Amino acid sequence: MAESVERLQQRVQELERELAQERSLQVPRSGDGGGGRVRIEKMSSEVVDSNPYSRLMALKRMGIVSDYEKIRTFAVAIVGVGGVGSVTAEMLTRCGIGKLLLFDYDKVELANMNRLFFQPHQAGLSKVQAAEHTLRNINPDVLFEVHNYNITTVENFQHFMDRISNGGLEEGKPVDLVLSCVDNFEARMTINTACNELGQTWMESGVSENAVSGHIQLIIPGESACFACAPPLVVAANIDEKTLKREGVCAASLPTTMGVVAGILVQNVLKFLLNFGTVSFYLGYNAMQDFFPTMSMKPNPQCDDRNCRKQQEEYKKKVAALPKQEVIQEEEEIIHEDNEWGIELVSEVSEEELKNFSGPVPDLPEGITVAYTIPKKQEDSVTELTVEDSGESLEDLMAKMKNM
């Protein structure tokens, strides 16, 4: 009897887990009112509690963004829906992006719970399915397209390229931006290869294995350095990174660092898409010193990726074809704002005197003048003063001086 009760309790627990998974898989369609509301066709700046976009539209009123509603016209692909990618997807969803394409082959595990976004009851689901369900409930206005596969395989690579080149907001048009949020070099190089071949702008992000530093990088094929222009040592040495992993050893992971990296990544995405502020080509983050280094890297003319070299040549031709603008610098007159009486300083030395004291000016080409000349050497002339003898004695002269 006791065994039967125990089996029934186990069966109840199994059914409860299955029910939780089924509820997670019941993803509401766009416009079905995910999150308890219907789809909003047009963003409004009306300040009411029921408007999810009022705080975002305030950016336009404050002069930060000229047209925030334009964000609904963009499609962004996110490769890797882990600690950085899932938070990135959530932020873009809350910002009201037009469409998100999510790529990941992994499943949610309890070991992921130290990161952000995922919940324990989603364990066992694919990351893209779990993310889509949660994101649709946050904002049903966003369109989602999810792909549960590994982009590094030969079979899936062509499909991945097809979706980023034809999976835009309008079918047949490319996405506006690809975001790399993966945790291995093989996947980064795969994204780099695809984007170089298609001429697709993308942003790369990463967090260090000790979890206290990270970075983001904007890569415009031909204009800035691609991931293969200056690859990490593990890639340059052709080492199989799978051999670097050891049993029972994993990389450290902090939700704070991943949240910071995801935040600066999405901030850079918004500035790039909505054209405000300064877009960073490279921005690092060091949590130990709270240091944010920035830089820009030029592409390597000897890059191993032939498509990168091809994009560089096309970019040079594009720049050469631009009309050259001649910059004419006008000399500004010095204006003394506090000179009410029109007082002018006049030199006490005349031009003739200045010319006499100036040295010879060499014959120079047109447009070149000397800063100064060596003054002429003045000949020392000694003038002797003579006094005529008056014939008076010394006593007479002394007497005259006393009478003065």
Swiss-Prot record:
Gene3D superfamilies recorded: NAD(P)-binding Rossmann-like Domain (3.40.50.720)
Listed result of changing residue 346 to A: Abolished interaction with UFM1 and decreased interaction with GABARAPL2
Effect of residue 336 to A/D: Impaired ability to activate UFM1
GO cellular component: cytoplasm; cytosol; endoplasmic reticulum membrane; Golgi apparatus; intracellular membrane-bounded organelle; nucleus
Principal localisation: cytoplasm
Effect of mutating residue 371 to T: In DEE44; reduces UFM1 activating enzyme activity; reduces UFM1 activating enzyme activity; reduces UFM1-DDRGK1 formation
Motif (UFM1-interacting sequence (UIS)): 334-346
Short sequence motif named UFC1-binding sequence (UFC), residue ranges: 389-404
Renumbered residue ranges of the record's region Linker: 347-377
Annotated binding of ATP, by residue: 83, 104, 127, 150, 184
Keyword Lipid metabolism assigned: no
Keywords: ATP-binding, Cytoplasm, Disease variant, Endoplasmic reticulum, Epilepsy, Golgi apparatus, Intellectual disability, Membrane, Metal-binding, Neurodegeneration, Nucleotide-binding, Nucleus, Phosphoprotein, Ubl conjugation pathway, Zinc
Job of this protein: E1-like enzyme which specifically catalyzes the first step in ufmylation. Activates UFM1 by first adenylating its C-terminal glycine residue with ATP, and thereafter linking this residue to the side chain of a cysteine residue in E1, yielding a UFM1-E1 thioester and free AMP. Activates UFM1 via a trans-binding mechanism, in which UFM1 interacts with distinct sites in both subunits of the UBA5 homodimer. Trans-binding also promotes stabilization of the UBA5 homodimer, and enhances ATP-binding. Transfer of UFM1 from UBA5 to the E2-like enzyme UFC1 also takes place using a trans mechanism.
Name the record gives this protein: Ubiquitin-like modifier-activating enzyme 5
Organism: Homo sapiens (Human)
Lineage: Eukaryota, Metazoa, Chordata, Craniata, Vertebrata
